[in-house]
Amino acid sequence: MDAFKGGMSLERLPEGLRPPPPPPHDMGPSFHLARAADPREPLENSASESSDADLPDKERGGEAKGPEDGGAGSAGCGGGAEDPAKKKKQRRQRTHFTSQQLQELEATFQRNRYPDMSMREEIAVWTNLTEPRVRVWFKNRRAKWRKRERNQQLDLCKGGYVPQFSGLVQPYEDVYAAGYSYNNWAAKSLAPAPLSTKSFTFFNSMSPLSSQSMFSAPSSISSMTMPSSMGPGAVPGMPNSGLNNINNLTGSSLNSAMSPGACPYGTPASPYSVYRDTCNSSLASLRLKSKQHSSFGYGGLQGPASGLNACQYNS
């Protein structure tokens, strides 16, 4: 009765509020499977169709791409096979020359370093070579020759400059004898730059007092003095009448009196010929100052009646 009452109460409910009837037990799984299968069938079919439709395309694409890939691979292999052949063709083989060929080529190179086409062809005939080989050999040989010339010039510039400079300085020390005491200070003042004008400032800036103190030194005049026992006749090449005229000596006559014929200790010619005018002017100023300063020991130059030679002045 309760169930009947419950069923009647459910029937009295409106349709919107009624619960769905329970499905039967035997139809439940099949119903669920049918409902689950109904919407899935078109999806599976579509998926299968799409997969079936796509697979041939992919296979076809794979099959189509396979030959292309294979063709590309084969082309790559063919290119790889062709590249060494091209490299071998482009790369020239090293030519091995015989001694006879080298002798002929060297002899021709000594005569002419730039042979023309006809001469290269003749050389190729003589040496049993091709003209391009002969041309390349001459090109390489010229490059080697120029490199050797440059290296030789660099060696000469590096190692030959000091000997050349010393060669300019060294002869001035070897020309003079060791007995000349004035060579010491002269060589020291002239050795750095014998031909430059900077060395002349030593004489140009020399005052009369400094020149007097220099020439009054025993080392500079003692070598030029002569013994008092040697008379006028003992001087070779100087007559007695010439000795009487030495009273009127000037700077120029003093220079002529100191020639090798009049004085056994003649002044060397080459290096000091440049300084003679400067020395003469300094000697003239020395004579003028010696008259005022008699304490410097130049008594022989004070009086005009002095009959001594230029080499006989005593300090």
From Swiss-Prot:
Sequence-specific transcription factor that binds gene promoters and activates their transcription. May play a role in the development of anterior structures, and in particular, the brain and facies and in specifying the identity or structure of hindlimb. Can independently activate and synergize with PIT-1 on pituitary-specific target gene promoters, thus may subserve functions in generating both precursor and specific cell phenotypes in the anterior pituitary gland and in several other organs. Can activate pituitary transcription of the proopiomelanocortin gene. The keyword Zinc-finger does not apply. The modification Phosphoserine is found at residues 46, 48. InterPro entries: HD (IPR001356), Homeobox_CS (IPR017970), Homeobox_Pitx/unc30 (IPR016233), Homeodomain-like_sf (IPR009057), OAR_dom (IPR003654). Expressed in primordial Rathke pouch, oral epithelium, first branchial arch, duodenum, and hindlimb. Residues 55-68 have a biased composition (Basic and acidic residues). Keywords: Acetylation, Activator, Developmental protein, DNA-binding, Homeobox, Nucleus, Phosphoprotein, Transcription, Transcription regulation. GO terms for biological process: branchiomeric skeletal muscle development; cartilage development; embryonic hindlimb morphogenesis; hindlimb morphogenesis; myoblast fate commitment; negative regulation of DNA-templated transcription; pituitary gland development; positive regulation of transcription by RNA polymerase II. It holds the Pfam family Homeodomain. It comes from Mus musculus (Mouse). The modification N-acetylmethionine is found at residue 1. Residues 69-81 have a biased composition (Gly residues). It is found in: Nucleus. A motif (Nuclear localization signal) lies at residues 287-291. Residues 17-26 have a biased composition (Pro residues). GO terms for cellular component: cytoplasm; nucleus; transcription regulator complex. One of its GO terms (molecular function) is DNA-binding transcription activator activity, RNA polymerase II-specific. Residues 1-104 are annotated as: Disordered. Residues 86-95 have a biased composition (Basic residues). Residues 90-149 bind DNA. This is Pituitary homeobox 1. Interacts with POU1F1. A motif (OAR) lies at residues 281-294. Residues 151-280 are annotated as: Interaction with PIT-1.
